[in-house]
């Protein structure tokens, strides 16, 4: 219980301004009206009913905050996207399961929080935390100047926030009124493919958002619906899959579908999660496709989506024993989930503290996509 973060304390984190610059030592970041919390939800550990993390919907954007001091405070955030804390969409649910397991791992370790992590919490919380790192003479002499925080960011690359419904389905046949417009869902695979095509070969007549209206009234809206229909055909999408509203697309068919559409490469064969490779792709202005499910035949939570950016906080903490800087990076990936403006934002991947393992379960990545 010593390291537990209360809902009230997590709210202090959520209402602070999220910034790419984490170097501030101030504990008084003032939340603006846009950071006002509208809804909140506690995600509990099913094993012991203890909090693992908190989800905050704000007047503008959202923040997901850890419930334990042994992992970094901000796990995910956006300053513009919407989130419904009580109805988490596919894709986000996969990340959420991964985040919960990382926090469980940190809680199993009885060690106190790492100094880098604790100092990050101290920037947000009103209570004083006991840091284990007492500064030595070398820190005062040169360590504080030698060990500097930096950050790197790329993206977001996409300008579209398309979904599976409304204008995305105007060229699809009716099928159970799945999209509130009397038509089938476009499918997560075709949405990802269509957004890739729009990124590489933009048609600015197409709307940036597909939600909000059922019928196309101009050439750009018609073009969007047609592109979705073509991508569904190229990827052999199965509409109303197994008698449901789901539209299912195999990842292999996404790759071959992009190639058939005219891309020079629909994606490489190795789909193992590799942050360095993802970062390299994004630095080259190439979004990557993520896909996954909680198990091999768990089709209900299966999803395909795009990653179009990253943000890394590079921490440097002086070690009084070794007289060296301890380096560690905390990494976010920017996700465009293919649900319109729902839940898009930066999500933490890799290590949640410097002592933790780096694993990402049930996630696959398609890299090497080229127009």
Question: Which functions belong to the PLM regions below?
Answer:
Residues 246-261, 357-370:
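Catalytic cores of secreted or luminal carbohydrate-active enzymes
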Residues 6, 10, 42-47, 51-53, ...:
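Noncatalytic regulatory segments and standalone regulatory/sensor domains
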């Amino acid at each position: 219980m010593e390291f537990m973060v209360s809902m009230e304390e997590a709210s202090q984190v959520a209402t602070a301004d999220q910034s790419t610059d984490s170097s501030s030592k101030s504990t008084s970041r003032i939340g603006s009206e846009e950071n006002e919390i509208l809804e909140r939800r506690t995600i509990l550990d099913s094993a012991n009913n203890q909090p693992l993390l908190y989800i905050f919907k704000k007047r503008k954007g959202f923040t997901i905050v850890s419930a334990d001091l042994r992992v970094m405070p901000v796990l995910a955030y956006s300053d513009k996207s919407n989130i419904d804390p009580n109805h988490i969409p596919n894709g986000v649910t996969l990340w959420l399961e991964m985040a919960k397991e990382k926090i469980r791992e940190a809680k199993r370790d009885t060690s106190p929080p790492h100094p880098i992590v604790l100092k990050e919490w101290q920037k947000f919380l009103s209570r004083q935390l006991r840091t284990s790192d007492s500064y030595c003479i070398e820190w005062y002499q040169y360590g504080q100047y030698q060990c500097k925080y930096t950050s790197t960011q790329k993206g977001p690359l996409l300008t579209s926030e398309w979904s599976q419904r409304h204008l995305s389905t105007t060229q699809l046949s009716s099928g159970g009124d799945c999209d509130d417009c009397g038509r089938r869902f476009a499918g997560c695979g075709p949405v990802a493919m269509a957004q890739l095509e729009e990124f590489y070969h933009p048609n600015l007549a197409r709307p940036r958002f597909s939600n909000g209206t059922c019928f196309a009234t101009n050439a750009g809206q018609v073009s969007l619906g047609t592109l979705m229909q073509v991508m569904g055909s190229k990827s052999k999408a199965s509409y109303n899959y197994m008698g449901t509203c789901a539209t299912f697309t195999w990842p292999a068919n996404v790759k071959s579908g992009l190639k058939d559409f005219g891309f020079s490469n629909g994606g490489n064969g190795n789909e193992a999660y590799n942050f360095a490779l993802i970062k390299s792709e994004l630095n080259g202005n190439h979004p990557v496709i993520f896909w996954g499910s909680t198990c091999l035949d768990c089709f209900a939570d299966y999803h395909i989506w795009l990653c179009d950016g990253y943000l890394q906080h590079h921490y440097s903490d002086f070690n009084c024993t070794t007289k060296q800087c301890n380096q560690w990076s905390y990494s976010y990936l920017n996700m465009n989930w293919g649900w319109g403006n729902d839940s898009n934002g930066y999500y933490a991947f890799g290590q949640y503290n410097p002592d933790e393992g780096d694993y990402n379960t049930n996630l696959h990545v398609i890299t090497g996509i080229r127009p």
